[in-house]
């Protein structure tokens, strides 16, 4: 497969010290990138001193790497975790490496996809995902 398109995942930033990718939290290093060596739990949950729920203070996209983007031209369905059937817009296939396992998006996460020829440049919500033999990631958007 010739992976030529681009996939980015949204980072949610909390207190300029932690980032959330999927359901995991990591500290931000001096370069502003996630430090995948130490994982934190429940940084984004809880309440502030006024009793308001903690929310991300900022968000940005980080490059996951190359991928293939396939539009759903046949109105195919994918089954979601809640049992619903969903007609997805795009199917994404991306190669995985050990480094990328910390950046797996989950249902509800936002990703940005960019086609090499510029025909697609969209921010979309992940509706479903799976991994194949720890070598490939498949997303339905």
Annotate each predicted stretch with a short phrase.
Residues 2, 6, 16-19, 25-141:
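Short, conserved turn/kink motifs that form compact alpha/beta structural patches or helix kinks used as
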